[in-house]
């Protein structure tokens, strides 16, 4: 469950096209995290570290669960991350759902104190399609030492969500899942029961994409979106789905 808020500015934009990233790599020398797992060995952006999506998620029985700070810190150190160095998150880019993986990693890093972050829009496939180099050398990052603090600023607790459903907190519950899940016609294995949270509105995460595309569209009318959902100025939004994957895209 993710609470929305404004992004902190860095040298990189939160979302970058392959061309934008290619034009800034020499200047900023970002750490590139390839979150695709085994596919990394088949080819990746030159210089990218392999950082499988599962490193940022909970156990198989509850992948949406947050990891404890010590575990996160150890994993970030093994990836050679530095708090003051730009980081690029790269998914496969095979479909719109892939973006949720990158967004979930982005959210986890941001909540852990990393401020200069970007997602490669369209992922590795968009990078390769644009003609930029792909390599197969396995990068072994040098471990770092970190002391992170995980902020709860963008996390909603169960107790807080219950208060929202009771009208005790003025926040908007936003269900990122397809309409069939929202209506209870389908159910994910991770869900306790079919349906949605009381009072929640539905905004399918794929609405941010042109049908069939893996990159988020730039033609998003924010004012119209706020009006459609009835979002008030400065109102907090609690984004949710089944495991924090699709919800991260809406966040």
How does the language model describe each region?
Residues 1-5:
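Bacterial N-terminal signal peptides
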Residues 58-86, 205-237:
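Helix-loop module immediately N-terminal to the HCX5R catalytic loop
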Residues 70-160, 164, 186, 195, ...:
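Thiolate-centered catalytic microenvironments shared by cysteine-dependent enzyme domains
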């Amino acid at each position: 469950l993710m609470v929305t808020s404004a992004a902190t500015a860095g040298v990189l934009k939160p979302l970058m096209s392959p061309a934008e990233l290619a034009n800034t790599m020499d200047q900023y020398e970002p750490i590139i995290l390839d979150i695709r797992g085994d596919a990394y060995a088949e080819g990746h952006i030159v210089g990218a570290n392999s950082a499988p999506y599962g490193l940022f998620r909970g156990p198989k029985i509850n992948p949406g669960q947050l990891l404890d700070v010590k575990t996160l810190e150890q994993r970030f150190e093994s990836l050679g991350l530095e708090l003051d160095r730009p980081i690029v998150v790269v998914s496969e880019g095979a479909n719109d759902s892939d973006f949720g993986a990158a967004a979930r990693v982005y959210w986890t890093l941001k909540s852990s104190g990393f401020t200069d972050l970007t997602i490669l829009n369209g992922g590795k496939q968009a990078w390769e399609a644009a003609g930029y180099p792909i390599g197969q050398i396995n990068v072994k990052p040098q471990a770092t030492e970190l002391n992170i603090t995980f902020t709860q600023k963008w996390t909603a607790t169960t107790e807080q969500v219950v208060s929202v459903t009771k009208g005790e907190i003025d926040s908007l519950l936003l269900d990122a899942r397809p309409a069939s899940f929202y209506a209870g016609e389908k159910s994910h294995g991770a869900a306790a029961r079919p349906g949605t949270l009381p009072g929640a509105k539905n905004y399918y995460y794929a609405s941010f994409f042109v049908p069939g595309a893996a990159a988020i569209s730039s033609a998003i009318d924010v004012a119209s979106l706020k009006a459609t959902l009835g979002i008030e100025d400065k109102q907090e939004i609690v984004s949710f789905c089944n495991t924090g994957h699709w919800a991260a895209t809406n966040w």
